[in-house]
Each structure stands twice: as structure tokens, then as C-alpha cells.
């Protein structure tokens, strides 16, 4: 079953205007979209998702006249709003940056290191390279960098060397458990977390261009939102949260130094201002008991002045 993490908190903090125009940047299975639609009267909602399964689900289950689903990355939200004369007219944006439960639980998608399936990991299976292809094409140095930066993996180079050696001997790594077992055999189990966790995260981020897409969205987000409009971001790992926090902070306090990861201070910072609505919120005990995956979720909400 799919749970939308921090659902009530994020929707409440968006302060929904029943006549407003809203964007769900990550439709998933529509938990946040449904909650927004329930609060709209003459307003409308535009949702984005790269996952064709999510698009199919939306078209089957969200047949509302004030709802539109767009098969695209949230990085294209600015371009969409530009093309549809919506720049500066959006009342709020919700982005739930986590991988959805249906994606994780469906072994055929290749995201899980506990269920065997093809090593794919693409959010949009209609294009791009699979995780298996990425492992074959990337050099040891590039693979090590991805594991270290995107996965914060201490043994990045050791794992990268083992993977490339394995591929040289066997031709490819084609399944999720094949990769997970190779990582476990390389570094052992040194903590409670599955030893493949960080590398799978890193590979998923790389295959789906996740951080660059997030940067692209945040780079132009204030041109999309109207004055008084709000942005709610739910992140699930430190890299995402760091980008969100530092971008928001830079727009609230433009004098702070450049973010070493994103380099994204606004060009004319004196003209751009936000205020915090929720600086940091985490799932409460009830939600943690319902959905263990919510334990790492962080909600941050800002308002454009």
C-alpha cells in the first residue's frame, strides 16, 4: 500500500486557496493531489510525473475536469508554465521527492535490493539507460564518484573496482540481487542498514538525473509562484534536503555564501525574497508506526513574499 508521507502537514502548510492553481511536481499515486483537489472549488491542479505507471494510474483514477496529468520531469515545470501563460500565477507547489512504494515494491522496476528483478531503476522506462547499462559504461573513477557523492558511500572505490572486475569477467550485472550480493560480499554488513542501500540510492539518482532535475526546478521556481504562493518540499535523503534547504535559505538570506553543491544563488538576489512557513518538520510517532519509510522524511515549506 502506498502512503503519502507528511500528507496533512504539507497540505495544511500550503494553505490551499479553493480558487487557486496548484502543481503536484511528483504525482506518484496521487495522495497529495487528491488532498489538494478535495480543497479546491473552482481552482485546478496540474500534476507531473516521469513514471508511465503513475501516468496510467492518474488517467484511470483522476478523471476530474480541474485536473491535468503531464508525463514529464518536474524540471520542465517552468517551461510548461511559460508555454501555458502560467508564470507567476501558481498558488502552490508540492514536491514529494521520495521513490514511491509501488516503485520500490515492484521488483520488475529494479529499485529494490531485497527483491530480485532486472537492474533497471529508470523512473521513465520509455527512455534513458538502465542501471545495468550504466554500470557497464561508466569508468571506475566515474562509478566511484557517483557512489561517493550521490550515495555518501565510504567504500565507493572498493565497490566500483569490484563491480568493474565482475563485469569484465561475467559480461554484465543484470539483476538487482546480483548487484546487492556483490556489494555485500565486497564490504560485508557493518551496520543495521543493508550494505547495498547507499550504492542503490546513488545509482538511482544518476540514472534518473534526480539532483540535476531538482536544481533545474528550484532555479526557476520563483518565476512560477505568485506572491503569497507556497512551496512544500518533502525530501528523503541528505543530498536532496541539503539542496532544498540551501536554495530556500539563499532566497531568504541572499547574502549567505554560495552553496558548494548547487551554486544557485539568484542573479538579482535583492529582488527575490521568501519566508519560512515550516523550516523543518518530520513524521510523528503515529505516522512512523504506519509507514516505516517516513522515518527519513523532512518537510520544508516557504512562501514567496
UniProtKB/Swiss-Prot annotation:
Enzyme class: transferase
Protein known as: Ribosomal RNA small subunit methyltransferase H
EC number(s) recorded for this UniProt protein: 2.1.1.199
Alphabetical list of SUPFAM superfamilies matching this protein: Putative methyltransferase TM0872, insert domain, S-adenosyl-L-methionine-dependent methyltransferases
One Pfam family recorded for the sequence: Methyltransf_5
An example Gene Ontology molecular-function term: rRNA (cytosine-N4-)-methyltransferase activity
Record's keyword terms, sorted: Cytoplasm, Methyltransferase, rRNA processing, S-adenosyl-L-methionine, Transferase
Keyword Protease: no
An example Gene Ontology CC term for this record: cytoplasm
Amino acid at each position: 500500500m502506498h502512503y503519502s508521507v507528511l500528507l496533512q502537514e504539507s497540505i495544511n502548510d500550503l494553505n490551499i486557496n479553493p480558487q487557486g492553481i496548484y502543481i503536484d511536481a511528483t504525482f506518484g499515486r496521487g495522495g497529495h493531489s487528491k488532498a489538494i483537489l478535495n480543497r479546491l472549488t473552482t481552482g485546478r491542479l496540474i500534476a507531473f510525473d516521469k513514471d508511465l505507471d503513475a501516468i496510467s494510474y492518474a488517467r484511470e483514477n483522476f478523471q476530474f475536469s480541474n485536473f491535468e496529468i503531464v508525463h514529464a520531469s518536474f524540471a520542465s515545470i517552468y517551461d510548461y508554465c511559460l508555454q501555458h501563460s502560467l508564470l507567476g500565477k501558481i498558488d502552490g507547489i508540492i514536491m514529494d521527492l521520495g521513490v514511491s512504494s509501488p516503485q520500490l515494491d515492484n521488483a520488475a522496476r529494479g529499485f529494490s535490493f531485497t527483491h530480485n528483478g532486472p537492474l533497471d531503476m529508470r523512473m521513465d522506462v520509455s527512455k534513458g539507460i538502465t542501471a545495468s547499462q550504466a554500470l557497464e559504461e561508466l569508468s571506475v573513477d566515474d562509478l566511484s564518484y557517483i557512489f561517493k557523492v550521490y550515495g555518501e558511500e565510504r567504500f565507493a572505490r572498493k565497490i566500483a573496482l569490484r563491480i568493474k572486475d565482475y563485469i569484465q569477467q561475467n559480461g554484465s550485472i543484470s539483476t538487482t540481487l546480483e548487484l546487492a550480493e556483490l556489494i555485500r560480499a565486497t564490504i560485508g554488513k557493518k551496520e543495521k542498514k543493508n550494505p547495498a542501500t547507499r550504492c542503490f540510492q546513488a545509482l538511482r539518482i544518476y540514472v534518473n538525473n534526480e539532483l540535476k532535475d531538482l536544481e533545474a526546478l528550484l532555479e526557476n521556481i520563483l518565476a512560477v509562484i505568485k506572491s503569497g504562493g507556497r512551496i512544500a518540499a518533502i525530501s528523503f535523503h541528505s543530498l536532496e534536503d541539503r539542496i532544498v534547504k540551501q536554495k530556500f535559505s539563499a532566497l531568504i538570506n541572499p547574502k549567505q555564501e554560495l552553496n558548494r553543491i548547487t551554486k544557485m544563488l539568484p542573479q538579482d538576489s535583492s529582488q527575490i525574497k521568501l519566508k519560512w512557513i515550516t523550516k523543518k518538520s518530520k513524521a510523528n510517532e503515529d505516522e512512523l508506526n504506519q509507514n516505516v519509510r517516513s522515518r527519513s522524511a523532512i518537510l520544508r515549506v516557504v512562501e514567496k513574499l
